[in-house]
Amino acid sequence: MGVHSDDWIRQMVKKHRMIEPFEESQVRKKVDGSQVISFGLSSYGYDLRVSREFKIFTNVFNSVVDPKAFDPRSFVEMESDCCIIPPNSFALARSVEYFRIPRDVITICLGKSTYARCGIIVNVTPFEPEWEGYATLEISNTTPLPAKVYAEEGLAQVIFIQASEPCSISYAERNGKYMYQKGVTVPRL
């Protein structure tokens, strides 16, 4: 059991299309030379990008936030080059990359320090064995001020961990509720 390196990630992308699209190295600048929050392959992980699709939490209906009966009207949907998250609120987004996780691997996804140092916290649950889809990203603004997130730039790092043995039942085999998700996905039961 251990954390996989850039060579393993690159090999899994070539053989099994584990990450699509895939950036072979860390990207820090756009073609025009302007800086971006880095994304792409790193030494022991992959820095995923956030897409242009966002759902910003507003609670205009004064709903109780209930994971068993979540009201999707609590979100305002938008597509943009950036997302302004209200103070002490959050947004959902999705990764640019589509992931296919091997049966004997689980991932941990951690927010990039560039955002964390600004009070913007990213939460993503592990990508389980044989899970496949776009990752839904939870982005919290812990500050008393509006916070800006840049689409098509790095948001979080995925670390791939080798299991000591393959699992008995994979996420796909138990028909996980977030299997093959395409867009920003709100809570499901």
Curated annotation (Swiss-Prot):
Catalytic reaction annotation: dCTP + H2O + H(+) = dUTP + NH4(+)
Record bears the keyword Hydrolase: yes
EC number(s) from the headed UniProt entry: 3.5.4.13
GO MF term (any one): dCTP deaminase activity
Pfam families xref list: DCD
Binding of dCTP, residues: 112-117, 136-138, 157, 171, 181
Record: active site: 138
Pathway terms, separated by semicolons: Pyrimidine metabolism; dUMP biosynthesis; dUMP from dCTP (dUTP route): step 1/2
Key words, A-Z: Hydrolase, Nucleotide metabolism, Nucleotide-binding
SUPFAM superfamilies in the cross-refs: dUTPase-like (SSF51283)
BP terms from Gene Ontology: dUMP biosynthetic process; dUTP biosynthetic process; nucleobase-containing small molecule interconversion
Subunit field text: Homotrimer.
Function per UniProt: Catalyzes the deamination of dCTP to dUTP.
Similarity comment: family membership: Belongs to the dCTP deaminase family.
Stated name of the protein: dCTP deaminase
Organism from which the protein derives: Methylacidiphilum infernorum (isolate V4) (Methylokorus infernorum (strain V4))
Source organism phylogeny: Bacteria, Pseudomonadati, Verrucomicrobiota, Methylacidiphilae, Methylacidiphilales
